[in-house]
């Protein structure tokens, strides 16, 4: 069946379950990816818990130091492969989505593989140096990559923007205009890079929106657009 991969934020977060999965490291919120509704529409939903996230102890979290997009990417794709092997996931109808670090991983994944037919990245990082310099909390990257002038190669090698030319998956980028945690500059840079290369990409900017959208009408529109995006690119017929 068509399968959507939901990647949690963090990276040190995780997923709880209910009508809407919540990021464990952020206050309760309406998630932009209504997975219960998506499941009702005929999608299988994979909630991977890759290394770097909650539940693996210090060693598991340190596995992604100077290595974002490496062991975590392998873990996510191993989960996809398992569902395909079990006959649950149709390998020709895969989608990937996530916000914050989940958005970063979504951006990263579409630069590394063409297996997904559609992707949606919310409040996502594309240029790690930008995040360090422009985010109100960018100093957290020091724990993973040191400072940009101390590790230029590491920042570039783990930034999706560096590999924008590799993207073949249609990508929807959603971002709050006033996001203080992951400034919108990165979304614009990734969008313009992909657009300049003729890639299939759309950018939705939510006025007044922060790292998490708080206005009910914007929350509803964000969910609606995600449902619409995956329906457009992934056929849900059994």
Task: Name what the model sees in each region.
Residues 11-13, 45:
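Serine-hydrolase catalytic-loop signature spanning alpha/beta hydrolases and amidase-signature enzymes
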Residues 16-17:
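A flexible loop/linker signature enriched in serine peptidases of the S9 family
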